């Protein structure tokens, strides 16, 4: 029997990586020119304010305040999933699905990735995907694959949609609304560019995920996961062999219908229907959550998941004490994920405190003024990759960059639409791999995949996507 190769794994935890990055930003703030102020207002691009020790130390703590809404959502999501798991419906449902797909499990991958990507391109699904990491981890492990496959389905699926945002209000919408008054933008061109970026990125992602999934399914020893990660994966998601007579009870079927309905309503709640002139959902759920479907955010979703957890508990005849204990235990399981999400926000907090974001974007704009036309899109893309590591929020980056880069593109005779989509695409690319994105770090923690392992596997995928993006964006910049 051939000896299994020892898998290399970067041992640094997610917390350590994020904290080291925050300290690095603090050091960088002292190496750049000092900022100039006029009447307590910074002269844009003049420099940065060196971070004080207490500002560096406090930034991860202040990240909690910045992430309180998503943290509460993730905590309640954990309680909801624990209630579902306690009924046995999800585990049995997965077993039934795998049994029916016997030999065709790989067909799930492109279908699921397309669904996630559709949510990404329409409303920027990212933090909302956290619960799916655990769900798909169980499914893919049962199907003979590993949690790299399940993580890639969620992250590259939703991420390809975010990268190629078409009508996403948190990316395209935020960027267009941040442009100075009078800047002309053709929404049709933006949707066209976004669609091409979305589908091309999705195709590349599906190819790499399918290739790896086939290899692991054929030979489990070919997994990129370290032995430690494999042990954690098996302990959390590994189950006994599926019984031949496995089937769902009537109560379990109802539970799974309610489970699917919960996520479906959440997705409908996040899609900005009013942006498309659709008023059908106006008034829906307003009496329950305070906001109609289409105007939801994390607070409304958290309330919805809490309500559905209670309903599922009642359907399954759970006693009050058992329900509360189960829900609290599930929420407790998410504490590590919540800490990672919150601490990751600390990098953005320190960026604002030191004006490092302001310095980078204004000096980047100066650099782009002298760039030849065919290099404008590639340089703009690279600049926004750097910015996105520091400001992973698509709406935050749009508010920072679009008012400066958009008009500059127009003045130089370049397409404003292609410039906006360059910003969006660069941010989407970085959010496939950056440690400053709490959703990535939290999702990988749930899947028992270490960040170093994800970077090792996804690096080639991200590089391929970046090259394709640059070629397409350069063509669009020259055409429009």
Each model region followed by its residue ranges:
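Long, contiguous bundles of hydrophobic transmembrane helices that form the permeation core
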Residues: 2-15, 39-42, 191-326, 446, ...
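Alpha-helical transmembrane segments and their helix-start/interface "positive-inside/aromatic belt" motifs
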Residues: 5-22, 141-155, 246-259, 326-337, ...
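Core transmembrane alpha-helical segments of multi-pass membrane transporters/permeases
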Residues: 11-23, 43-91, 291-359
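Hydrophobic core segments of alpha-helical transmembrane domains in multi-pass membrane transport
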Residues: 15-31, 74-82, 115-119, 157, ...
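Interfacial/capping segments of alpha-helical transmembrane domains
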Residues: 27-54, 274-286, 354-363
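Membrane-interfacial loop-to-helix junctions in multi-pass transporters
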Residues: 53, 65-71, 99-111, 143-149, ...
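Hydrophobic alpha-helical transmembrane segments of multi-pass integral membrane proteins
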Residues: 75, 103-135, 341-354, 367-407, ...
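Alpha-helical transmembrane segments and, especially, the helix-loop junctions at the ends
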Residues: 117-133, 137, 143-193, 204-209, ...
């Amino acid at each position: 029997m051939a000896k299994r190769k020892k898998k290399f794994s970067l041992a640094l935890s997610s917390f350590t990586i994020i904290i080291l990055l925050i300290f690095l930003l603090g050091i960088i703030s002292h190496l750049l020119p000092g900022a100039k102020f006029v009447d307590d207002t910074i002269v844009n691009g003049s420099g940065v304010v060196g971070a004080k020790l207490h500002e560096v130390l406090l930034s991860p703590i202040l990240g909690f305040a910045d992430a309180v809404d998503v943290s509460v959502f993730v905590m309640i999501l954990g309680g909801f999933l624990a209630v579902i798991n306690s009924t046995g419906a999800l585990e049995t449902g997965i077993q039934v699905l795998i049994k029916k797909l016997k030999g065709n499990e790989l067909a799930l991958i492109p279908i699921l990735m397309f669904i996630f990507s559709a949510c990404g391109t329409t409303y920027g699904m990212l933090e909302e995907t956290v619960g799916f990491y655990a769900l798909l981890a169980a499914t893919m492990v049962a199907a003979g694959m590993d949690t790299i496959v399940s993580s890639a389905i969620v992250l590259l699926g939703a991420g390809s949609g975010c990268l190629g945002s078409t009508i996403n209000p948190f990316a395209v919408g935020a960027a267009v609304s941040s442009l100075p008054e009078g800047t002309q933008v053709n929404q049709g061109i933006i949707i066209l560019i976004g669609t091409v970026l979305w589908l091309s990125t999705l195709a590349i992602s599906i190819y790499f995920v399918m290739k790896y999934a086939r290899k692991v399914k054929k030979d489990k020893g070919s997994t990129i996961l370290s032995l430690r990660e494999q042990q954690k994966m098996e302990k959390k998601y590994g189950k006994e062999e599926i019984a031949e007579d496995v089937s769902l009870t009537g109560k379990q079927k109802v539970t799974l219908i309610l489970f699917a309905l919960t996520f479906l309503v959440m997705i409908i709640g996040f899609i900005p229907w009013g942006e498309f002139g659709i008023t059908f959902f106006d008034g829906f759920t307003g009496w329950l959550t305070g906001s109609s479907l289409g105007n939801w955010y994390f607070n409304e979703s958290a309330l919805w998941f809490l309500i559905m957890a209670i309903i599922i508990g009642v359907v399954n005849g759970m006693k009050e004490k058992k329900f509360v204990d189960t829900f609290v235990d599930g929420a407790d399981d998410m504490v590590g994920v919540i800490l990672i999400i919150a601490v990751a926000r600390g990098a953005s907090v320190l960026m604002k405190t030191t004006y490092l974001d302001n310095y980078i974007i204004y000096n980047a704009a100066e650099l782009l003024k002298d760039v030849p036309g065919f290099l404008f899109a590639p340089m703009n893309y690279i600049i926004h990759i750097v910015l996105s590591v520091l400001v992973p929020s698509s709406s935050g980056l749009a508010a920072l960059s679009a008012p400066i880069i958009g008009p500059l593109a127009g003045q130089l005779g370049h397409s404003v639409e292609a410039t906006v989509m360059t910003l969006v695409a660069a941010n989407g690319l970085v959010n496939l791999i950056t440690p400053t994105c709490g959703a990535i770090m939290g999702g990988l923690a749930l899947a028992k995949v270490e960040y170093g392992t994800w970077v090792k596997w996804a690096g080639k995928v991200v590089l391929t996507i970046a090259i394709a993006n640059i070629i397409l964006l350069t063509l669009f910049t020259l055409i429009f």
